[in-house]
Curated annotation (Swiss-Prot):
Residues recorded with modification Phosphothreonine: 93
Subunit and interaction comment: Interacts with protein phosphatase PPP3CA/calcineurin A. Interacts with isoform 2 of BSG/CD147. Interacts with FOXO1; the interaction promotes FOXO1 dephosphorylation, nuclear accumulation and transcriptional activity. Interacts with integrin ITGA2B:ITGB3; the interaction is ROS and peptidyl-prolyl cis-trans isomerase (PPIase) activity-dependent and is increased in the presence of thrombin. Interacts with MAP3K5.
Cellular-component GO terms for this entry: cytoplasm; cytosol; extracellular region; extracellular space; nucleus; protein-containing complex
Residues carrying N6-acetyllysine: 28, 44, 76, 82, 125, 131, 133
Name this polypeptide is given: Peptidyl-prolyl cis-trans isomerase A
Family per similarity comment: Belongs to the cyclophilin-type PPIase family. PPIase A subfamily.
Signal peptide range in chain numbering: none
Organism lineage: Eukaryota, Metazoa, Chordata, Craniata, Vertebrata
Regulation of its function: Binds cyclosporin A (CsA). CsA mediates some of its effects via an inhibitory action on PPIase.
Alphabetically ordered keywords of this record: Acetylation, Apoptosis, Cytoplasm, Glycoprotein, Isomerase, Isopeptide bond, Nucleus, Phosphoprotein, Rotamase, Secreted, Ubl conjugation
Biological source species: Rattus norvegicus
Catalytic reaction list: [protein]-peptidylproline (omega=180) = [protein]-peptidylproline (omega=0)
Length: 164
């Protein structure tokens, strides 16, 4: 089985930054990977297209995936509001790691973050389910619009997304 690849086309205040491609680790975390894949294609009638990265902290991570409230309090999974932590096999080993944001144990929805550093303190708390395959320079460009409190200086949006 080949792990799926999905893409995000990113804009900053409507100006194209470029494309980020992710490999989703369906071989290790099939349920979590499938959620992100289906939210990227929009095949269930809702998903990431048009949503933004509401929290970007340089040297830490870029967080997005709240397509219902757009502020970090919303989002939902393809399995309903929330789903359980699948496993913690994969670790936050460095830049480019894709992991689920949550509000405590077993509260996965649609919010995720892309690490821009090694974040080992998140191991065992957040489910790692993918990595940046291409376009890490785009993630670094996104990071430049972040701040220490996470507020972005430009609106960083997923203008298009899907499966490759």
């Amino acid at each position: 089985m080949v792990n799926p690849t999905v893409f995000f086309d990113i804009t900053a205040d409507g100006e194209p930054l470029g494309r980020v491609c992710f490999e989703l680790f369906a071989d290790k975390v099939p349920k979590t990977a499938e959620n992100f894949r289906a939210l990227s294609t929009g095949e269930k009638g809702f998903g990431y297209k048009g949503s933004s990265f509401h929290r970007i902290i340089p040297g830490f991570m870029c967080q997005g995936g709240d397509f219902t409230r757009h502020n970090g309090t919303g989002g939902k999974s393809i399995y309903g509001e929330k789903f359980e932590d699948e496993n913690f096999i994969l670790k936050h080993t460095g830049p480019g790691i894709l992991s689920m944001a949550n509000a405590g144990p077993n509260t996965n929805g649609s919010q995720f973050f892309i690490c821009t550093a090694k974040t080992e303190w998140l191991d065992g708390k957040h489910v790692v389910f993918g990595k940046v395959k291409e376009g890490m320079s785009i993630v670094e460009a996104m990071e430049r619009f972040g701040s220490r409190n996470g507020k972005t200086s430009k609106k960083i949006t997923i203008s298009d997304c899907g499966q490759l």
